[in-house]
């Protein structure tokens, strides 16, 4: 029993000592919502800054634009959710500013509804094919 207790305590101590020793990566997830017609300009601006990898999806949203009235078959309806494009770009810390600058350069018209950019911390990234983790997985 004594050896069993020692073994259990040693296992618990090993587990506790490993807490907080997870590798810390310096990466960010940049999420941007832009006008659909500005997508090509944003992609071009990002390519010029050597940012080539991104996920693009359709989104609906509202903000200061507030929407508009639309008439369809004689009925007037208020459209409050407007079409947007959502970009998700995972970058290493040294690419954050150039990525944000590229999005702003391509998306800005000066009008309400140009969009928003969110920069979020990202704990990890795993390339499924190779198992690479962290900055190496982003590429």
Predicted regions and their residues:
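Positively charged, small/polar-rich N-terminal and surface patches that mediate targeting and assembly
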Residues: 2-139
């Amino acid at each position: 029993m004594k050896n069993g207790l020692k073994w259990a305590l040693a296992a618990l101590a090993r587990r506790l000592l490993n807490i907080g020793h997870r590798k810390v990566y310096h990466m960010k997830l940049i999420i941007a919502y832009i006008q659909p017609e500005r997508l090509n300009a944003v992609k071009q601006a990002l390519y010029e800054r050597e940012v080539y990898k991104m996920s693009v999806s359709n989104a609906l949203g509202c903000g200061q634009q507030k929407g508009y009235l639309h008439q369809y078959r004689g009925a007037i309806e208020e459209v409050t959710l407007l079409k947007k494009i959502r970009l998700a770009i995972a970058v290493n810390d040294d690419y954050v500013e150039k990525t944000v600058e590229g999005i702003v350069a391509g998306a800005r018209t000066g009008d309400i509804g140009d969009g928003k950019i969110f920069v979020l911390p990202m704990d990890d990234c795993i390339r499924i094919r190779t198992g690479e983790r962290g900055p190496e997985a982003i590429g």
